[in-house]
Amino acid sequence: MATVILVRHGRSTANTAGILAGRQAGVSLDDVGRGQAESTGQRLAVVPLVEVVTSPLERCKQTAAAIIAAQSGKPRRSTERGITECDYGDWQGRALKTLAKEPLWKVVQTQPSAAAFPGGESMTAMQARAVAAVRRRDAAIEAEHGPGAVWVAVSHGDVIKSVLADALGMHLDLFQRIHVDPASVSIIRYTATRPFVMASNTHAGDLSWLVPPPAKTSKSRKRASADAAVGGGAGPSPVPSSPHS
């Protein structure tokens, strides 16, 4: 079971201006966003990542660069169009306070499965291609690096919310109940029977429990169970810290 860490890009210049950026060019992290990306990179530094996959948009590339810079190893970096921002079409580049007056706004809020942006894509199509991309990448990474592999997908708010909703078995019409902040960390572990959502929209906390255990030489090594922990379980075992000299 590989593990994917979903990271939303840090705060962007469009976020600060109250603009729905979509896929328009020229949107990058602002000063706060760069600091957020660096902080998230430091938080993930304890976890040896095998790959950092990013949306092709600049704000995500900048966030991915900060995560890679904090790694002691050299995780592979790649771009995945399947996790790019929703194509908001004619809504792109417009002020959110203006868009809130549009009839479609209420549909986006209450029945997103029926929302299709004029000149763009539907939210159902966005979820379908994002979930397919994450699951495909996860399976490929596990096949290459083994079930203990941990990787990062740097993407966008609505995209990450839709992936989390799928993992939780939620209908897309309920996905607005999920909140995903800039530079936040959410964690999913896919298995043959079900996905496990290990964390959602976190900003702090130790992540050393994601570090894979040392490889065993025995061919009889047990694969991690895909069963849920009835009663909740004891939680992850922390990685012992190195003794101080």
Regions found by a protein language model. Name each.
Residues 10, 157:
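Active-site metal-binding loops of divalent metal-dependent hydrolases
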Residues 11-67, 116-132:
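Loop-to-helix element that buttresses phosphate recognition and phosphoryl-transfer chemistry
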Residues 104-125, 222-225:
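Short glycine/proline- and acidic residue-enriched helix-loop micro-motifs
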Residues 3-9:
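Short, hydrophobic/glycine-enriched beta-strand segments
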Residues 2, 86-97, 143, 147, ...:
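Acidic, low-complexity terminal tails and accessory targeting/binding regions
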Residues 38-106, 240-245:
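Phosphate-coordination/substrate-recognition cap region in phosphate-metabolizing enzymes
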Residues 4, 147-155:
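Generic beta-sheet signal
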Residues 45-48, 137-149:
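Glycine-rich phosphate-binding loop signature in dinucleotide/nucleotide-binding domains
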